[in-house]
Amino acid sequence: MKLKKFLLTFNAFQFFFSLLLWVPIFYEYQKRVGLNDTEIFRIQSIYYLVFCLLEIPTGYLADWIGHRVCLILGSVSLIVANIWIPFNPSYSGFLIHFILIALSRSFVSGASSAYLYETLHQRNELDEYKEAEGKARAYSLLGKVICWALV
């Protein structure tokens, strides 16, 4: 794959992976299906705890099985989480949903930068890394700002 196509694909991944279009309305959805504030914020607390606890193991796993594989695993777990919740709108359903999202985000968090770095290193294009990483993060942020405003 040519460098330009690779960077376009990488930026698209960063843009779409971080969208999470449901975030601005999810609190209201949880309230409407019967969760109270204590339950909602307990789930959020567990999400952040699980995310932090999974950071090191998933980083190690990414180094062991490959960063690209972890990007795929992160994407699959995010898809499963978002398919899961409409069929399980309960406290335990939301808890599983957010644990899967924590797993997904921990798979991708360091693996995406490492994958970009490794790919550019293999192509002898490391001088492009800072700009490519910056653009990818900008596209991720741009997606959130524009799309969340529309939701």
Summary of predicted features, one role per range:
Residues L35, W64-G66, D127:
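Membrane-helix interface residues
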Residues Y48-I56, L141-A149:
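Residue-level signature of mid-helix packing/kink "hotspots" within the transmembrane helices
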Residues M1-L53, W84-P86, F98-L100:
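Helix-loop boundary and gating motifs at the non-cytosolic
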Residues L19-L21, F87, Y91, L103-A111:
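Hydrophobic transmembrane alpha-helices of Major Facilitator Superfamily
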Residues I99-S140:
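Cytoplasmic helix-loop-helix junction between adjacent transmembrane helices
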Residues V76-S90, F94-L95:
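C-terminal ends and interior cores of transmembrane alpha-helices
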